[in-house]
A protein has these predicted regions:
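Terminal targeting signals and extreme-terminal segments of soluble enzymes
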Residues: 13, 21-114, 120-195
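Compositionally biased low-complexity segments, especially N-terminal hydrophobic helices
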Residues: 6, 17-22
Length: 195
């Protein structure tokens, strides 16, 4: 099992939790499910706010929203067959080139989270997708993250085209899982209002 996204300095308990998530285990003390269906969105990833994610303000620290979105990205890559197994078999991977995270509502210790992921587009070298994090019980949206990933040839560690069969599969996935309209928050930029 690869823990390539887990920082070396993380304590053993946090590394174990990440390993359980990556392995898709459901007996790790919190739910972790990957649903694949032909209905939109492409995946739904679930998690629970853990004690080590709570900051001095009594809510989940902003960094852990990104961690949950990263776990959802791993689930997305597995669902699209561009995850760890793809990297090992092809020598290719995906690197995140750009993200934009918008925090909308607090979440607290023990809150169940659901992340829905939408495919916004793909070309020969890029994948554009959008995560929405919801409070599972209330249904309120808590945060969103928009991402652009680049396809990388790991042998030279440079951007490279997807192999033709993978590119075709991604195009089919985008057709199947693209939202009818852009989700609220997609395409935003950070700027001060004009005066």
């Amino acid at each position: 099992m690869s823990l390539h996204r887990v920082p070396r300095g993380w304590p053993a308990s946090r590394r174990a939790a990440a390993a359980a998530i990556e392995a898709g285990l459901t007996n790790a003390g919190f739910p972790n499910k990957l649903h694949r269906s032909m209905s939109r969105p492409v995946i739904e990833y679930e998690d629970v706010v853990r004690p080590e994610w709570i900051d001095s303000n009594g809510h989940m620290n902003l960094a852990y929203y990104v961690v949950v979105f990263d776990f959802a990205t791993d689930a997305l890559y597995r669902a699209l067959d561009i995850g760890d197994a793809y990297r090992e078999a092809s020598g290719n991977s995906c690197f995140t080139a750009e993200t934009h995270t918008l925090y909308e509502r607090e979440v607290h210790l023990g809150d169940r989270l659901q992340v829905r992921t939408w495919l916004l587009g793909a070309d020969t070298k890029r994948l554009h997708y959008f995560h929405e994090m919801f409070h599972a019980e209330s249904g309120e949206r808590s945060a969103v993250q928009e991402l652009m990933a680049l396809h990388i040839d790991m042998g030279i560690r440079r951007v490279a085209p997807y192999p033709p069969e993978q590119y075709a599969a991604l195009q089919q996935a985008v057709k199947a899982y693209a939202p009818a309209t852009l989700p609220n928050g997609a395409g935003r930029r950070i700027a001060l209002p004009n005066r």
